[in-house]
Amino acid sequence: MQALDGHLHVTGKSGYIARYRAPQNSLSYPGDAACAQDASCHKVDSGQYAGDFWEGNTSRDQYTGWFFGMAMAYDLIDDEPTKQMIATDVAEVVHALMADYWWIVDVDGQPTTAGPNIMSPMRATWLLIAYHMTGAADFKAQLQSLLTDKARLGYDIANIDIMNHYTQYYGNNLSHTTWYNLLRLGKVYFSPADYQWFVESFDQHETFTRLSHNAWFDEIYMSQGPYAPANPDPYQTQLVDDLTDFFAAPNVEYALPARTNFTMDPMSELLNYLMTEIPFLQQIMGNVQPQALYAFPVPQQCAGDFLWQHNPFVITACGNDNPEHTYPGVDYLIGYWLAEYHKFVTKDM
């Protein structure tokens, strides 16, 4: 929690979270070497964080992870000083966003150039988290304005995710991470009708990610969505299989050859053709490559820093055999932890 607190306060700008923070001259990532040429890189030479550097131009992606970590820690620990620190930090960030009309504003007074506008689902989730921690009237009032019937169109537009099936797949991770606390806390604070609307919206929009050999996504659906266990239960079976199949530590980078046994997704072929014939579509929507109709099991997915945010439908060769490049393993840890927390697996499994 000190790390998340530090990411907020190292910037010196109230309510603005750093994209990254580390000691200067770090052996693991000497990113401060670029500070002389990169306007978003900042060295700190005085105060509490003297000797650190941080990167700005922060996006809603980083804010999503920061809020998720703060929200979960707040409800899972019983250390009151730490809980108060979390609540104070969250309130500071949300107040800054409210003051800037839900844009992430950098230290230069301008919105960042990397996803700075906060869309309805994230606004509601972060306000809900802040209200949950503080009970502040201003958070409640703005949250209520996002729960009116006329506000629902904003959620529907923000939740359109068809292209995240084929490009910018990481967007599915951001949406699932947001949905988790929106539904978890919405169950407590929303009216039954509003809560049910959000559950149904989640069910309608997050479809192609289910049973896609993504333990993280399935756990969020199983714990917060309209999941009804069957007998036999494909969700439970695949969840256990995916966690069991996860790569043993150390989780090093590996080369994966092109997959050969799969059914092609015809929509991906069509989109690839259209973008070849009409290049400006690629500029608008991103590059689409032909991919499989069904997700590959974990051992046949490309290596990555956080496996669950990468596309499991990729058919091309990827990665390199590089035992010196070790991934942190947080993807397995969060996948296992959430499954155990919600009793989908037990510690003796």
Model-based region annotation:
Residues 1-7, 90-124, 130-349:
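Ser/Thr/Asn(+Pro)-rich, low-complexity disordered segments
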Residues 2-116, 120-121:
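Extended ligand-binding groove/face enriched in aromatic
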